Amino acid sequence: MIISEKIYLTEDKKASLEVIGLPMFDQSRSAWQAEERPVAVIVPGGSYLYCSDREAYPVGLTFASKGYQVFILRYHVGDESDYPRPFLDLSLAVKYIKENKEKYKLDINNITIAGFSAGGHLVGTYAGLVNRKEFHEISGMDQDQLKVKNIILGYPAVNLKPIAEKINHYNIHDKVGKLFTTYDEIKDGKALAYNGMANVFVFHSIDDDMVYVNEVADYVHHLTTLGVNVEFHLFNQGGHGYSTGNKFTNPKEGFPTRVGVWMDIAFDWLDSLS
């Protein structure tokens, strides 16, 4: 049986957490079941115009099947998507999770946040913001309260400068939320990265025509120069927005099935860090 509930993080109800997971089993009857579950926060993309269900529930349910307690974040988008609003939404999500560890039986020392496309930008940038004093001040939280153990970035728009330049060059401001229309270092995941940030897992495809491969490779290279613990997987085909990359999200349309192995690789990576 899947338990699902919705927690509003802000008074306007535009940021929320959906809780998805399995009930805790009787310890005496299921000795294999850990008392505390690792946590996965899923942050879907949608160009900061909307939050994609395709990158929310299929990924979340797959994490739940691996024993994770899953939380799906819905954050401010559109004209309300610029810094700092979505990052504050994520900080409130992390705060809620850590403050409710007993309610959900959570291992709050083993939190992974997975973001896709624009959600990958949000997550990658947040991972850098946890080290910035100005973000501590506006969030009311310190680095220890904000930080999580791992982040997973799927075809992420995390390298903001070339993305903002493309949007302005082609005048496609109506195709994205406000955050992507201007550049500022404070909302650039590459510029904010630092030695000691969360462990990073990145996957991408060479033929992605929305977030170019060189933009992601440049971000990963920058992490390596800083000494960040990063793992990078680059697929020959996949395009953009494939979520789980299997029949869970692509039941009829043709797609490069090999990209779906990213989840198996990611779970193996997470296990290696535990």
Specify the residue positions occupied by each region the protein language model found:
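Conserved alpha/beta-hydrolase "acid-adjacent" motif
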Residues: 209-218
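Primarily recognizes the serine-hydrolase "nucleophile elbow" in alpha/beta-hydrolase
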Residues: 95-167, 180, 184
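N-terminal cap/lid segment of alpha/beta-hydrolase-fold proteins
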Residues: 1-35, 162, 166
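Catalytic nucleophile-loop/oxyanion-hole region of alpha/beta-hydrolase
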Residues: 52-53, 71-108, 256-258
